[in-house]
From Swiss-Prot:
Pfam families recorded: Cytochrom_B_C
Annotated compartments: Cellular thylakoid membrane
TM stretches of this protein: 36-56, 95-115, 131-151
GO cellular component: plasma membrane-derived thylakoid membrane
Role summary: Component of the cytochrome b6-f complex, which mediates electron transfer between photosystem II (PSII) and photosystem I (PSI), cyclic electron flow around PSI, and state transitions.
Coiled coil: none
Record-given protein name: Cytochrome b6-f complex subunit 4
Species of origin: Crocosphaera subtropica (strain ATCC 51142 / BH68)
Length: 160
């Protein structure tokens, strides 16, 4: 049961505050304890109940069931490791592949020092950081997509 206090619009103090831009909901219902103790748990438990119900009624399969008697031609890692796997697979020297994996975070650490003159947060006013981000995103998607192809088609993604 919510207790609502109606504003007295004839009060000169309230009219002065409203004239200065104070919101109309000044006399509204407080968030503590009403929302935090009653509304939020209902929403959280309802969401959990909905997710559990969907998982029980319609379970999603995670890939094909394992068959111990059929080995795939090429064993692939999880999807989020495809770019790393592709770098190690394409480069001829494995030490070079590991060095490339270490060079990626080191290169990202250098970006703030390269662009230290620029103090803006807007990406359109930070061309070096934006270019590094876009280049890294495109290369990561390209490597991740190429990891699913055979080794001879992996760099061209089977297009050429």
């Amino acid at each position: 049961m919510a207790i609502e206090k109606k504003p007295d619009l004839s009060d000169p103090k309230l009219r002065a505050k409203l004239a200065q831009g104070m919101g109309h909901n000044y006399y509204g219902e407080p968030a503590w304890p009403n929302d935090l103790l009653y509304v939020f748990p209902v929403v959280i438990l309802g969401t959990i109940g909905l997710l559990v119900g969907l998982a029980v009624l319609d379970p999603a399969l995670i890939g094909e069931p394992a068959d111990p008697f059929a080995t795939p031609l090429e064993i692939l890692p999880e999807w989020y490791l495809y770019p790393v796997f592709q770098i190690l697979r394409v480069l001829p020297n494995k030490l070079l592949g590991i060095a490339c994996q270490g060079a990626i975070p080191l290169g990202l650490l250098l970006v703030p020092f390269i662009e230290s003159v620029n103090k803006f947060q807007n990406p359109f006013r930070r061309p070096i950081a934006t270019a590094v981000f876009l280049f890294g995103t495109v290369v990561t998607i390209w490597l991740g997509a190429g990891a699913t192809f055979p080794i001879d088609e992996s760099l061209t993604l089977g297009l050429f």
